[in-house]
Each structure stands twice: as structure tokens, then as C-alpha cells.
């Protein structure tokens, strides 16, 4: 009897914290679940930890092949919870600075912020698009450089006037002193 109890205690102790890999995932459930393989052991469906699950929510699920930690209350793997991923040879660390927060996606997209250099970078793969919906407006403080075309569905205005006002001046302006030949005209009667 005591041997059985010691064996059971040893099994439970060994199952308190288990390292394994995600081998199955079901993201369709209200509480997404994973199956983990650790050596010859394969768990039942277990819930995975998320960053937020209250009035604010987050979604970035663990995937098949990721190395994880399973924490099992009382050493009962049926009650286990899958904690976050661990780097491994197949998926090494992508950073080497405590000042950098970096996310790299499977399609090549990279989003990184460095708090020391105060630099935010978002690089998307070729053909990617970006949508920002902010019906209250967007305010940018600082110089803006655009490489490529700018399209606007409404007028564009600077500190002097709008582009439409400039077009109106250009289309309606006149010059005095107009003569034929090589001479130039006087300045416009209405400044731009």
C-alpha cells in the first residue's frame, strides 16, 4: 500500500510541471484547447494561457510544434494549463536586447519597438496592405516622408490654403502686360 502511495506521489510530482510540444490545436472552441506531447505521454485537450481574457481580450494562440510548459495542479495532467512557448533550436530567439519588443510573423512581417532608441518599425511583406480606421481623426506630430503616391477622397489643406483653393486661383488668374514675342508676362494679378 505504501509503495503504491509513493509511486502515485512520484507520478504526481513529475506531472506538476511538464515540458512538451503542441501536437494538436482546436481554436474553434470558446476556450481554445491544445494537446501536448512530452516523451511518450500525450495529454487530453488542455486550455492555453492568454494575455488578457476580461473586458480587454487578446488572441495570439500557440501553434503546433511550439515547445510549451504545462502546469498541472496537484500533478493531475487532466487539469493542466498550457503556459507560453519556449524558444528551441527550431524556433530560436529573435532578439538580443531588453530594450526591444519584436514580433515576427510567418509571412515575413516584422513589428518592433525599441524603447532606448524610441523607434517603432513595421515592415510588411510585398503586396501587404494596411488599414487604419479612426473616425475621430489622426494627428501626426513630426515630419512625414512618403515614397509613392498619395490619394485623398477630400481636399488637402496646409497652413495657407487648400489644394482646391490653389486650383481655383491657378485656373482663374490673369496677367497684365501680355505681349507677343519673346517677352515674359508680368506677375499674376492674384498670388498663389
Please report, for each region that a protein language model flagged, where it lies by residue.
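Heptad-repeat coiled-coil amphipathic alpha-helices that mediate oligomerization/assembly
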Residues: 2-13, 156, 166, 170-173
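Generic signature of intrinsically disordered, low-complexity segments enriched in small/polar residues
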Residues: 7, 108, 162, 173-178
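Low-complexity, small-hydrophobic/phenylalanine-enriched stretches
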Residues: 113, 120-140, 144-168, 179
Amino acid at each position: 500500500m505504501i509503495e503504491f502511495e509513493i509511486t502515485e506521489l512520484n507520478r504526481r510530482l513529475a506531472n506538476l510541471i511538464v515540458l512538451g510540444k503542441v501536437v494538436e490545436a482546436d481554436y474553434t472552441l470558446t476556450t481554445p484547447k491544445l494537446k501536448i506531447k512530452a516523451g511518450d505521454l500525450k495529454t487530453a485537450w488542455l486550455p492555453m494561457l492568454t494575455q488578457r481574457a476580461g473586458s480587454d481580450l487578446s488572441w495570439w494562440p500557440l501553434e503546433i510544434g511550439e515547445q510549451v510548459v504545462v502546469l498541472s495542479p496537484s500533478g493531475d495532467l487532466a487539469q493542466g494549463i498550457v503556459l507560453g512557448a519556449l524558444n528551441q533550436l527550431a524556433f530560436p530567439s529573435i532578439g538580443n536586447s531588453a530594450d526591444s519588443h519584436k514580433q515576427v510573423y510567418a509571412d515575413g512581417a516584422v513589428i518592433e519597438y525599441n524603447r532606448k532608441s524610441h523607434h517603432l518599425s513595421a515592415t510588411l511583406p510585398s503586396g501587404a496592405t494596411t488599414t487604419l480606421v479612426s473616425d475621430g481623426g489622426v494627428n501626426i506630430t513630426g515630419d512625414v516622408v512618403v515614397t509613392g503616391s498619395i490619394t485623398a477622397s477630400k481636399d488637402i489643406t496646409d497652413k495657407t490654403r487648400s489644394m482646391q483653393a490653389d486650383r481655383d486661383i491657378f485656373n482663374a488668374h490673369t496677367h497684365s502686360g501680355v505681349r507677343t514675342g519673346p517677352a515674359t508676362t508680368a506677375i499674376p494679378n492674384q498670388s498663389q
